[in-house]
Amino acid sequence: MNRLAVEIPGLSLKNPIMPASGCFGFGQEYSKYYDLNELGAIMAKAVTPEPRLGNPTPRVAETASGMLNAIGLQNPGLEHVLAHELPFLEQFETPIIANVAGATEDDYVQVCARIGESKAVKAIELNISCPNVKHGGIAFGTDPEVAHRLTKAVKNVATVPVYVKLSPNVADIVSIAQAIEAAGADGLTMINTLLGMRIDLKTRKPIIANGTGGLSGPAIKPVAIRMIHQVRAVSNIPIIGMGGVQTVDDVLEFLIAGADAVAVGTMNFTDPFICPKLISELPKRMDELGISSLQELKKERANQ
């Protein structure tokens, strides 16, 4: 028996470790460093119906224990991804989770209806932190009713399981999670980045051209752990946890808090080998802590 194996809707993971969307592209660059078959899954870069150039530069800034980014969902568009990016990933056994973004509900529906055409795509990750241009630019994921409606619309057309990525920039993440689960989501991924800003002391202006950016990295891990713990208390659907993962102990902390699998984001930029390192270190650390399997952690959680 594979003690690291995880079974969640659409995904048979050989281990619980995967790179997070936006930190791994479509895998081609990282495939030069190691065999992508080592990974539990791959969360691919966000896809929108049409190509997007993204935000003006500068759009990345370092912070203490993290980084800010405002890339603006730069991507080559659905047709290009289906024709050129996903075929490369089809050579690997590793399941692909396609991240889908949009400016309108129709954008999401359009991409989700077709992204499953690739045999590599086993699940969708719905990025609901995008601004809804038809409703004043408020992010889809900040209103329970809007999040419920979008999830339901996507579930009606998707051919693979749908995981919804939760934004931490809300007053009550539990109510958002409950609305999404009620709409039929197969799982949740959490958390997305926290909204932040840095100021250039010489120009007296924000360093990032867009003004604000998403804060990621070790600084946000305690927030992610807290939110996963809160959501797990009211939700039974799978959670893929993320937010500041650096070490194998971080991985186990996320799993104990309530996650079923863990995604690694910002650390891929610091160490491109981080995912395979964590995968290789996990069994030894489990032995040291007396954990026989990941299923054991799940049972412990249920009894808390």
UniProtKB/Swiss-Prot annotation:
Cofactor note: Binds 1 FMN per subunit.
GO BP: 'de novo' pyrimidine nucleobase biosynthetic process; 'de novo' UMP biosynthetic process
Coiled-coil regions listed in the entry: none
Keyword Nucleus listed: no
A GO molecular function held by the record: dihydroorotate dehydrogenase (NAD+) activity
Cysteines engaged in disulfide bonds, as pairs: none
Co-factor(s): FMN
Binding site for FMN: S21, K45, A46, N99, N127, K165, I191, G217, G243, G244, G265, T266
Keywords: Cytoplasm, Flavoprotein, FMN, NAD, Oxidoreductase, Pyrimidine biosynthesis
Record's subcellular location: Cytoplasm
Reaction equation(s) it catalyzes: (S)-dihydroorotate + NAD(+) = orotate + NADH + H(+)
Cited function: Catalyzes the conversion of dihydroorotate to orotate with NAD(+) as electron acceptor.
Assembly information from the UniProt record: Heterotetramer of 2 PyrK and 2 PyrD type B subunits.
Family statement drawn from the similarity comment of this UniProt entry: Belongs to the dihydroorotate dehydrogenase family. Type 1 subfamily.
Protein name as catalogued: Dihydroorotate dehydrogenase B (NAD(+)), catalytic subunit
Organism of origin: Listeria monocytogenes serotype 4a (strain HCC23)
